[in-house]
């Protein structure tokens, strides 16, 4: 799967979150948050005192050992700057999840940051559904005018539509030649 959300966009998102000082983990600690996306018990520790990433990250986040809020973007275990789009989108959506983010002000700031940069790569945030009257966000490809036009053309190329136009032309040839010719011209313009 190719990445449509570029590493430039991802870095811009990380940089603005860092500048804004928004805790992307919300009310969870770093390990609890990341464990919602990755199985930290299966990932290696970068500290020989711990067997797994969960213990490593729990300890280091508890004692404030990470220099930046967005350290996880540059951690090779998560590869957020270069992972596939599906994983990156999951990460973004978890930061907006009501089980994670409890401050409306931070939620609004994150939504604005994500929307601003994702739009450049042709994506947008949207509300997938609600739980307990709270939105669960998703990210989707923005349909451009060309995409919409393509769907419209595909509808006209549907064999049922073409057949209905051909039948109309056949039935009108003897009784209303102008209508038959107009239908033929319309069909040709749509197809070509």
Language-model segments: which ranges?
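Short terminal alpha-helical segments
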Residues: 1-47
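Generic alpha-helical structural element
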Residues: 2, 22-26, 151, 158, ...
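Internal, Lys/Arg-enriched amphipathic helical interaction segments that engage polyanionic partners
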Residues: 39-164, 168-171
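Short, hydrophobic, well-ordered secondary-structure elements
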Residues: 166-170, 174-192
């Amino acid at each position: 799967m190719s990445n449509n959300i570029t590493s430039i966009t991802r870095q811009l998102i990380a940089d603005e979150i860092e500048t804004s000082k928004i805790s992307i983990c919300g009310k969870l600690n770093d390990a609890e948050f990341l464990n919602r996306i990755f199985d930290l018990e299966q990932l290696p520790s970068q500290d020989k005192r711990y067997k797994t990433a969960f213990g490593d990250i729990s300890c280091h986040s508890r004692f404030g050992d990470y220099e930046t809020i967005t350290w996880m973007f540059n951690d090779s275990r998560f590869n957020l700057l270069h992972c596939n789009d599906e994983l990156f989108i999951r990460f973004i959506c978890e930061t907006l999840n009501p089980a994670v983010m409890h401050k409306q002000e931070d939620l609004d700031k994150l939504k604005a940051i994500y929307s601003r940069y994702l739009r450049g790569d042709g994506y947008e945030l949207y509300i997938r559904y609600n739980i307990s009257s709270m939105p669960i966000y998703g990210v989707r490809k923005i349909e451009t005018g060309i995409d919409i036009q393509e769907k419209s053309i595909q509808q006209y190329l549907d064999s049922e539509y073409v057949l209905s136009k051909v039948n109309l032309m056949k039935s009108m040839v003897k009784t209303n030649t102008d209508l038959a010719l107009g239908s033929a011209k319309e069909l040709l313009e749509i197809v070509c």
